[in-house]
Amino acid sequence: MMKRMAGTIVLIVTLFSIPTWPGDSSPLFLQAERNAWQAQEALRHCYHYIHGWLAHRDPVSGLIPRNLTRSWFWNAQDSAADNYPFMVLAASLLDRDLYQTTLRQMLQTEIRLTNRLDNLPDDFDFATQKFVHPEIELPRLIFGGSEYMKDGLMPLTEWLGPTEWTGRMIGIMESVWKHAPVDTPRGKLPAGDHEVNGDQLQTLCRLYWMTGDERYPAWAFRI
C-alpha cells in the first residue's frame, strides 16, 4: 500500500514538474503549427505523385511514359531524367517498401530494355515493346544519357549516397565518352553544343569528388 502511494506521489510530482506547453497564443507555436501542416501537405502530395504515376505504368514493361497524352513511350531525357528519379527519392522518404521493391525493379527493367549502345539508353515504345527508332542515332543517345545523369541520377545520388542508381550514372558516363563523336584538337567530345557539354561539366565535376576517378576532371578540362 505504501509503495503504491509513493508511486502515485512520484507520478503527480513528475507531471506537475513538466514545463507547460507554450499554447496556441505563442508566435513560435503558431509558426511551428503552420510549418507542420505545410510539411504534411507537401509530403501528402509527394506520396500521391508517386502512386499516381505508378498507376500509369506500361503494364508489360512496368516503365513510365514520357507523358500522359500523346507520348506512350519511355525516353531518357523526360521519363528518366525528370520523373522516375524523383519518384525514387520521394519513396525513399515516404514508402520504403515501394522504394525497396517496385522502384528498384524498374531500374533493372530500364537497363535491360532501353540500353541501345553499351549503357546508352534509347526511346522505348510500349506498343511494340521495341525501340522507337529503327536506327541508332548517337547524338540522340548522348543527349538523353547526359540529361538523365545531370537532372536525375546525380540529384538522386547526392541525396541517397552510393546506390545502384549511382552505378547507372557511371555506366552511362563511361559509354558517353567511349562513343564521343566530335573531333577537337584536344580529343573527342560528346557533342558540339552547349547543352550536352554543360550537362557533362556539371556531372563530371561532382562525379570526380565522389569517386576520385582522374578521368572525370580530364574529360571536363577537355570540354
Give the location of each predicted region.
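Bacterial N-terminal signal peptides that target proteins for export
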Residues: M1-I9
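Glycan-recognition and catalytic cores of secretory/periplasmic carbohydrate-active enzymes
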Residues: P22-I223
